[in-house]
């Protein structure tokens, strides 16, 4: 289970079916582990806006995030702008949020500590 190790070090696993959809209690446990992220769409998605100095920094972040998404086989919806990127995670195969969304949110947040 992802909470035995830090979320940013966990790996995504395939999750299909509503039995993998997180309930309110588990969401309340995991949300504090991804500071800056918020529940959206009635708890069906995780959302965060990342701000950057310029377009180059924004694109560096987006490209690094694309590598993580490919590696974890879990892909966010992105809104890319000059000085910000809006990142939204949800697991369509479970009809809401799964632990994979929190794992990828933590990995995404960790990127900002490594980029210029």
Swiss-Prot record:
Top-level EC class, please? Answer: lyase
Give the reaction(s) catalysed.
(4aS,6R)-4a-hydroxy-L-erythro-5,6,7,8-tetrahydrobiopterin = (6R)-L-erythro-6,7-dihydrobiopterin + H2O
Q: CDD domains from the xrefs?
A: PCD_DCoH_subfamily_a (cd00913)
- Gene Ontology terms for molecular function: 4-alpha-hydroxytetrahydrobiopterin dehydratase activity
Which Gene3D superfamilies does the protein's record reference? Transcriptional coactivator/pterin dehydratase (3.30.1360.20)
Q: Which keywords appear in this protein's UniProt record, sorted alphabetically?
A: Lyase
Per its UniProt record, what SUPFAM superfamilies does this chain match?
PCD-like (SSF55248)
User: Which family is it part of?
Assistant: Belongs to the pterin-4-alpha-carbinolamine dehydratase family.
Query: What protein am I looking at?
Result: Putative pterin-4-alpha-carbinolamine dehydratase
The species this protein was found in: Stenotrophomonas maltophilia (strain R551-3)
